[in-house]
Amino acid sequence: APHTRVLRGGQVRRVPTREIVPGDWIVLGEGERVAADAVLRQAQSLTVDESLLTGESVPVRKRPSDAALAAAAAGPPGGDDLPQVYAGTLVTTGHGLAEVSATGGGTQVGRIGASLAAIEPAATPLQRSLRQLVRLFGTLALAGSGLLVLWHGLRGGDWVQGLLAGIALGMAMLPEEFPMALTVFLALGSWRLARMQVLARHPAVVEALGAVTVLCVDKTGTLTENRMALRRLVTPEADVTAQAGAPLPEPVHRLLEYAMLASRRGSTDPMDRALLTHGDQALNDTEHLHPDWRLEQEYALTPELLAMSQAWLDECGQRRVAAKGAPEAVIELCHLPPTSAADILAQVRRLADAGLRVLAVAEGSAAGAAPATDQHDYDFRFLGLVGFEDPLRASVPAAVAQARGAGIAVAMITGDHAATALAIARQAGIDTAAGALTGEQIAALDDAALAEAVRRVRVFARVLPEQKLRLVEALQSHGETVAMTGDGVNDAPALKAAHVGIAMGARGTDVAREAADLVLLDEDFSRIVGGVRMGRRIFDNLRKVMRYIVAIHVPIAGLALLPVLLGLPPLMLPAHVVLTEMVIDPICSLAFEGAPEDPRLMQRPPRHAREGLVGWPMLLQGVVQGGSVLLPTLLAYLLALRAGQHADVARTLAVVGLMAGNLLLVAVNLSAGLGWRALAAPGARPFWVVAVIA
């Protein structure tokens, strides 16, 4: 069981996390998970990764508070310099002491989990279609069987034969292949998705993917790689875009050198790690790496000065000082004149508008044998700016373009700043013409106004967890079929409410995975678009098999009904119906699952949410196809009887004709829209097996 350090009786003890209660004081250290919602009472350079709750990978600063516990514990997660820490979040730097305000179901995580019980997941289009089909065919079968029994019994008085005829007709009219075909298609679809690193928790959702009209995606970790990478280095002499593994020009070497010297080796801070990783590669063959220098003094970042410095002794014993931090703080350390400061801050804004997180770097010096007691005691010289980004996944632009080509609107929902969200959206190819709608603006809109706004806007920034759910519901109010991705506890309500909830596998929380329908094992956005392709293919092939099933039931039902109405010996006995429907039809239906996809599959717009699996035009096609088999088969039966053949011989002739017609119906429906090449596909092997046996 997990344990937590707790201050009790003036001593720090490790106790099981489940034994923590409100009022306990918990000790927080770098790399540790926070055990409960709490309010910071003491802290030193404490930053916390709250992506579990906010979806944003950049850690936030924490500041202790002496305010009343109840008032201090009221704020939402996210934002710098707040005193609250939350259960499940990760301490990335520093240490602290916090007073527990809530445990278990009373925490932010617990409340989000409890809210899932109140959300009813929407039925998939396939489920709605099947309910309609079951009602239609069930009603027809019951009515037809009952009328046939009454007609036969009242007309001839032979109630036993009438009952057998009614049973045969009911069996012929009830398409029991529907559930078999559906189960096989969805099971094999789930298997194919699993081979694409997409785990389907609910098989019915495989088909629903093909009906998606709006794909709502989180930025961090879905469109991006969920890591900080060094992207820009700006000095007075140069402005360089950094690329992993690529050499850097000499004018930015010193900037990167001192940015590394101001970073802690072994730190969990993502920007420190990005600087050190990139610098170790880019400066490997230069004199700007200093493994032999000794760290003399570290000056931690404080709420009053958002910059940190490290003093080093080089191989000659000379002190070298490096500082990095918020540009405003480093400008203050360098005592720059207002004009220079204004120029630097203008450059910072340009970098921020490009979606970068910006730090400033400075080089310091001081007289004296001992290191200074405060960062302000050094004479700093401004070196430049370093910009970081969470890199866009390489496969995303092509996948977004493919989704938009298929008529699917891609919307980004993130907790990040609007400028960053818009920059990433532009790189990904998401529509940014309407700008970004922020969480603050969403909160000011009523449901009707929000429903109107989501028609145009495709980028949503600074969004709170409960607002993600509102956005999904607003889209659904227009009849959109919504897919939603997420990984944090905060995403769970929206994942459950969406028609297709997609959780991240590697970094997703258990709560998010439980609420989702699909789990993206390798977190590659392009897999979602591949899943949409798979869903559309399954729906197309399901339509083909449903039309075939309707078509084959026309001659089966007709051959069971018409001879009785004409006063002839029964043609289709229950045994014949069982043989036809339970053996031949299912085997032929399997051929449809492996049918190749339409080459224009991803150029078509999504089908309408209310479009059923089998519409009246398709039913009519099936009836016409079935009638073309029924008429010659019935005619052969009548001619055989008129020629004086025994009823068994005539019946055998008709059943053989029905089997041949069945194969013809399979071939016609299998090749619909694809040409006869569909019969050569590997998935058509069951058809050829049955054809050879027949």
Question: What are the residue ranges of the model-derived segments?
Answer:
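Juxtamembrane helix-loop transition segments at the membrane interface in multi-pass membrane proteins
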Residues: 1-7, 106-118, 154, 161-162, ...
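Basic, amphipathic juxtamembrane/active-site segments
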Residues: 47, 54, 64-66, 70, ...
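Cytosolic catalytic regions of ATP/NTP-dependent phosphoryl-transfer enzymes
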Residues: 84-92, 211-382, 388, 401-402, ...
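Membrane-water interface of transmembrane alpha-helices in multipass transporters/channels
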Residues: 129, 155-168, 178-181, 198-209, ...
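Membrane-embedded transport module
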Residues: 148, 186, 432-484, 498-677
